[in-house]
Curated annotation (Swiss-Prot):
Keyword field: Activator, Apoptosis, Cell projection, Chromosome, Cytoplasm, Cytoskeleton, Metal-binding, Nucleus, Repeat, Transcription, Transcription regulation, Zinc, Zinc-finger
Major localization listed first in the record, in broad terms: nucleus
Family assignment from sequence similarity: Belongs to the JADE family.
Compositionally biased region (Low complexity): 15-26, 762-774
Composition-biased stretches (Basic and acidic residues): 374-390, 622-648, 738-754, 782-792
Biased composition (Polar residues): 1-10, 394-405, 570-586, 607-619, 697-714
A Gene Ontology biological process term: apoptotic process
Keyword Zinc-finger: yes
Name of the protein in its database record: Protein Jade-1
Organism: Danio rerio (Zebrafish)
Length: 829
């Protein structure tokens, strides 16, 4: 079915024109009226003819099935030329083939430059080739003068120095070239054509097409192309790798030097190709080039430890005999030179197996069994076996027997070389030199005779170094420089590795030290925080913590309610039963007076208040009886001990003050004591008036927030055993008392500290405007509870006095430094 087509717009035009494209079958009135030809024409009948209904019957080869979905833009049709007659026609004509003959080129000899050639514009190689390499010495100049005189007498042309140098250089060049060629051919030594010459790697004397035997022109080793990795035989001379580099290294796997060697991957070690093939752990990186030698480090240590049975040296890596139950070891090169039985077998799976045998098993008639080698092997006779029975197979004797033919060949070769060197003049023809240099034959012949005499005087050695050897020497020097630089960089790299390892270890050590210091700092701050918390919250917890740190004990559990410390005589002094009774009577009166204030602050009475109420009732009855009996005597005692009662009443009020108020009061007390230094003298007088014979130190010491006077006996007074305490200054101000001194010294010190504490509190009361903070917070006990407290305090004070009273440090030092000072002091003692 033919579909009607919607006219396209200007956006569909390829040339960007504003004209509208119409179909060929469309009848547009606009196009007829205008008379203009359309810019584009599309045929839609082709698309319509291509479409077939699915029910249409056609052969499969007559149509193509469209797998892609139909697109709407395909309905536009196929674009056709607007005017096919306007298409240009191509014109073709036959052109004759261009001639390949070269054009005229002007000869260089006809080209002349107006400017003279300068030295800088000439190549260095050209200048080097133009320079004569032979220089006349004084002897040559003297001979030249005598010869020119003879030439003048004979009527010949005199000879100049430059011509003589050129002739001598030509003699040396021709002699070297001809002698080298003679040594390489059968005419000279016949080395290449010797039937006994074998490959240094595979020990085979045969060569094949594409696998020729190549000889080194310097060390004269013979190798196959495939055995040494020679891809292409060079024209002229050929040098092996070691000779090309001008080095004579030692094999890394055997003690031998020389031979067909290849470098390892690093380039610093050299290995025989035969050693690399026979040692199973070693491999070759590129089999075509037969280098580099790899996996040398994979050789086990037990192979390096084997000792060669031929050379008796523990050097390199050895191989072992392939016979069963035979573990005789020998080097690969030693076995090859001694003629041991060493075969390469090609298996059916195209694998090469290497079989090597020791001298004992190499003497067997193995040709009949294997049949792979055509070389005759000497089978020892019965006489030889009987002669050699019981004698060790020494390396020297075997090497002497096996190397006799080779030594003979070497000696013959040396003789031939010596003979060639003696007859060096046979390799130079004077007439050829005269023809080449275009000089008179008589003059060249006279110079030839002089050259022969001078060279014989020089022990047949060349007068100038051959150009090739000179280039090789220069290349060798450059190679040596490169090797030295390589070694230098290798050592530098190793040194840098050592420095890096050292810096890593130092940085790791410093990090560990920093971590340790941080841990110690955290421990120190934790101790300080515990001490500060104990000082703020209460003296008892702080003192118990300090005792645990000072005396190396575990931290005792802190009780819920404050309790008196045992062992500190300055704070818990012993009291007699009569004094305790009077104190309980007077304290009960103050407790009764202070009880309403405490209930107002706390809000709810505690369990201790009930005990205090009972104490007040008993104390009131005792007070009534005491008033009827004594009267005025009790009144006088009350007036004399009123400061003590006021001090106790203020201590009860101090327990009810908050922590912030205590801190504020402690700070104000420190400021007051530090600012009012002029009151120290009055303080000393008041303290001396309350003591009988003991001197009291005037400097106040803060211990956990409370002031304390230091006894003068600790600063230079004699201790109970009569020794001075001044020598204990550098030992932490403590010493371990003797067993006989503990009881008496403890009691005496307790009494002195009790008196000092009382005097201190009275002096602080006199000079302070607010009540001072007590050292401990306790409650007064009455009746049986008070008596039980006295018994416990007596026992605790006696034990502490015996154990650790004299070991206590001053309080400011313990608060600042913690247990570290005590530990050092104990270690030092």
């Amino acid at each position: 079915m033919k579909r009607s087509r919607v006219p396209s717009t200007s956006e569909d035009s390829d040339n960007g024109s504003n004209s509208t494209s119409w179909s060929q079958h469309s009848n547009s009135k606009h196009r007829k009226q205008s008379g203009k030809r359309p810019s584009e024409v599309f045929r839609t009948d082709l698309i319509t003819a291509m479409k077939l209904h699915d029910s249409h019957q056609l052969n499969p080869e007559d149509y193509y099935e469209l797998a892609d979905p139909w697109r709407q833009e395909w309905e536009k049709g196929v674009q056709v030329p607007v005017s096919p007659e306007s298409i240009p026609q191509c014109a073709v004509r036959t052109v004759a083939e261009k001639s390949t003959a070269p054009l005229f080129i002007k000869p260089k000899k006809l080209i002349r430059s107006s400017e003279s050639s300068m030295l800088g514009y000439v190549g260095i190689q050209t200048l080097a080739d133009g320079m004569c390499r032979y220089d006349l010495n004084e002897e040559d100049v003297a001979w030249l003068q005598i010869t020119n005189e003879e030439f003048s007498k004979m009527g010949m042309q005199p000879l100049d120095e430059l011509t003589m140098e050129r002739v001598m250089e030509e003699f040396e060049r021709r002699c070297y070239d001809n002698m080298s060629h003679a040594m390489e051919t059968e005419e000279g030594l016949g080395i290449e054509y010797d039937e006994d010459v074998v490959c240094d790697v595979c020990q085979s004397p045969d060569g094949e097409d594409g696998n020729e035997m190549v000889f080194c022109d310097k060390c004269n080793i013979c190798v196959h192309q495939a055995c040494y990795g020679i891809l292409k035989v060079p024209e002229g001379s050929w040098l092996c790798r070691t000779c090309a580099l001008g080095i004579f290294p030692k094999c890394h796997l055997c003690p031998k030097k020389g031979g067909a060697m290849k470098p390892t991957r690093s380039g610093t070690k050299w290995v025989h190709v035969s050693c690399a093939l026979w040692i199973p752990e070693v491999s070759i990186g590129n089999p075509e080039k037969m280098e580099p030698i790899t996996n040398v480090s994979h050789i086990p240590s037990n192979r390096w430890a084997l000792i060669c049975c031929l050379c008796k040296e523990k050097t390199g890596a050895c191989i072992q005999c392939s016979a069963k139950s035979c573990r005789v070891a020998f080097h690969v090169t030693c076995g090859l030179h001694c003629g041991l039985k060493m075969n390469t077998i090609l298996t059916e799976a195209d694998e090469v197996k290497f079989k090597s045998f020791c001298p004992k098993h190499s003497g067997l008639d193995w040709n009949e069994e294997e049949g792979d080698d055509d070389r005759p092997v000497k089978v020892p006779t019965r006489e030889d076996r009987s002669r050699n029975r019981g004698i060790d197979f020494s390396a020297s004797s075997q090497t002497r027997l096996s190397q006799n033919p080779e030594e003979t060949r070497l000696s013959e070769r040396k003789l031939r070389v010596q003979q060639l060197e003696d007859e060096f003049y046979r390799f130079v023809a004077a007439d050829e030199v005269a023809e080449h240099l275009q000089l008179p034959l008589e003059m060249v012949d006279i110079l030839f005779q002089y050259w022969k005499l001078k060279r014989k005087v020089n022990f047949n050695q060349p007068l100038i170094m051959p150009k090739k050897e000179e280039e090789d020497s220069l290349a060798r020097r450059e190679q040596e420089v490169l090797l030295r630089r390589l070694r230098l960089f290798t050592h530098l790299r190793q040194d840098l590795e050592r420095v890096r390892n050292l810096t890593y270890m130092v940085s790791r050590r410093e990090r560990i030290k920093r971590t340790l210091c941080r841990v110690q700092e955290q421990i120190f701050h934790h101790h300080v925080r515990l001490l500060e918390q104990g000082r703020v919250t209460g003296v008892s917890s702080t003192r118990r913590l300090e005792e645990a740190m000072f005396y190396f004990r575990t931290t005792p559990p802190v009780p819920a309610s404050p309790q008196p410390l045992k062992g500190h005589c300055g704070q818990n002094s012993t009291l007699s039963s009569s004094e305790k009774g009077s104190n309980s009577y007077r304290s009960s009166k103050h407790i009764e007076a202070d009880k309403p204030a405490k209930m107002l602050m706390d809000g709810v009475p505690s369990s201790g208040d009930s005990v205090r109420s009972e104490t007040v009732m008993s104390a009131s009855s005792r007070r009534s009886e005491g008033r009827t009996r004594s009267g005025e005597s009790h009144r006088k005692e009350e007036e004399s001990e009123r400061p003590l009662e006021d001090r106790r009443r203020k201590s009860k009020l101090w327990d009810q003050v908050s922590i912030k108020d205590k801190l504020r009061h402690a700070k104000s007390m420190e400021d007051t004591l530090s600012s009012e230094t002029e009151l120290d003298t009055m303080d000393d007088r008041l303290l001396l008036s309350h003591t009988n014979a003991n001197s009291v130190a005037t400097a106040p010491n803060m211990y956990s927030g409370s002031p304390r006077k230091t006894n003068a006996s600790h600063q230079g007074k004699l201790v109970p055993n009569g020794t001075s305490g001044r020598h204990l200054k550098n030992w932490g101000s403590f010493r371990i008392p003797k067993r006989s001194e503990r009881t008496s010294a403890g009691r005496q010190t307790e009494r002195q500290e009790a008196d000092n504490t009382a005097d201190q509190n009275s002096s602080l009361k006199t000079f302070s405007t607010s009540p001072s903070s007590p050292q401990i917070r306790t409650r007064l006990r009455t009746g049986s509870e008070n008596r039980r407290h006295l018994e416990e305090s007596d026992l605790g004070q006696s034990e502490q006095g015996k154990r650790c009273h004299t070991q206590r440090l001053p309080s400011p030092m313990t608060r600042r430094y913690g247990s570290d000072v005590i530990q050092r002091g104990v270690l030092a003692s």
